Amino acid sequence: MDVEVKKKNSLKGVISVPGDKSISHRAVMIGSIAEGLTEVENFLVAKDTLSTVECMRKLGVDIKLERNRVKVYGKGLYLSKSSEVLDVGNSGTTIRLLMGILAGQEFETILTGDDSIKRRPMGRVIVPLTLMGAKIEAREGNFAPVKIRGGKLRGIEYKMPIASAQVKSSIMLASLYAEGRTVIEEPALSRNHTELMLQTFGARIEIDGKKIFCYPGSKLKGQKIIVPGDISSAAYFIVAANLLPNSEVVIKDVNVNPTRTGIIDVLKGMGGNVELINERYVNNEKIADIVVKSSKLKGIEIGGDLIPKLIDEIPVIAVAAVFAEGTTVIKNAEELKVKESNRIKSMTSELGKMGAKIFETEDGMIIEGTGFLRGAEVESYNDHRVAMSLWIAGLLAEGRTIIKKAECVDVSYPDFYKTFDML
């Protein structure tokens, strides 16, 4: 499906964005290995999270889904062998976190996914899980499909070579089945939803800076989880409202966990008008309403420990940088190369077609703020974050923009285009 987007004069209104994707995945997975009923409200109903639901069902978990409410009837730590290959679709979170759970199961499972998943690196998960005692085979180069036989695991001390919430989470989930303590050390803080949710369910997880101490032996108990709005989905509205004149948008009930708010930190650093109100905590997660108004942005340098806090938002930050005064440099973001597409290449190529002065580097991009884009026919590369970022570019461009394969937004935000029509 192709979509057409035309220049918009301003954005005004109050909206909600769908439930957080990371938290929705984790609520279903951890609820499945807990004892008793877990009820999840405001669950994100999208292709990625439904892949998690289907995989857990194939492992014997009874899950009832009604609109955005989910009931998970947990089986405890030990699941049932699937008679089928588990297909995670496009979901990197599903395959990597599920490998952690399957490392503790005394049966063999094969995991696969779509073409995008088969290009994404699995070695970063295979290495620590193998050290813990799981037996894992993968396609040459450590790519999916992956065959995993779990069993008796041992605790390890593991220094992660890259900051990755998915890798960290996989090890933490495996640690529930291990004999002895597991210690994980990150090079920089990545999103910490797994730590917070495991603590909510009753696991003994201790955090000391960039170190996480995981102790086995706790029984997980079913919980009621209220999923806050996803800041990664809110990011598109935050950027658009900053850039379009005479705009004011309020986004209700958004997750503002400090490991996820890099987009707000960066926009404020660029001079953006973003304010958090009505701050509170639900299920250990910080939530707020976000108020965004039009502003004039200036270019900055983005890198270092900030990158894991905004890795998914860099494509839309690139759009903001086109309309900022001066030059924006994004560095230390090599991880973008192994997302659903190579997002460095995708964004430099497609914004370039629209007239942006944007240049690819080894670990990021350099954007000169020209304040101008022209409409063009652009490719999404079947990458939801690229498609949504190009939609924002189209709202700001002169003339019309056509986005190819725009239905890929269904992975994380099926009503994305409709929500913009409300403003």
Curated annotation (Swiss-Prot):
It holds the Pfam family EPSP_synthase. One of its GO terms (biological process) is aromatic amino acid family biosynthetic process. Phosphoenolpyruvate binds at residues 21, 92, 120, 166, 343, 385. GO terms for molecular function: 3-phosphoshikimate 1-carboxyvinyltransferase activity. 3-phosphoshikimate binds at residues 21-22, 26, 164, 166, 312, 339. It is found in: Cytoplasm. CDD domains: EPSP_synthase (cd01556). Pathway: Metabolic intermediate biosynthesis; chorismate biosynthesis; chorismate from D-erythrose 4-phosphate and phosphoenolpyruvate: step 6/7. It is an enzyme of class 2 (transferase). It comes from the Bacteria. Keywords: Amino-acid biosynthesis, Aromatic amino acid biosynthesis, Cytoplasm, Transferase. The active site is at residue 312. InterPro entries: Enolpyruvate_Tfrase_dom, Enolpyruvate_Tfrase_sf, EPSP_synthase, EPSP_synthase_CS, RNA3'P_cycl/enolpyr_Trfase_a/b. GO terms for cellular component: cytoplasm. Its main location: cytoplasm. Monomer. Belongs to the EPSP synthase family. PANTHER family: AROM/DEHYDROQUINATE SYNTHASE, PENTAFUNCTIONAL AROM POLYPEPTIDE. Catalyzes the transfer of the enolpyruvyl moiety of phosphoenolpyruvate (PEP) to the 5-hydroxyl of shikimate-3-phosphate (S3P) to produce enolpyruvyl shikimate-3-phosphate and inorganic phosphate. This is 3-phosphoshikimate 1-carboxyvinyltransferase. It comes from Caldanaerobacter subterraneus subsp. tengcongensis (strain DSM 15242 / JCM 11007 / NBRC 100824 / MB4).
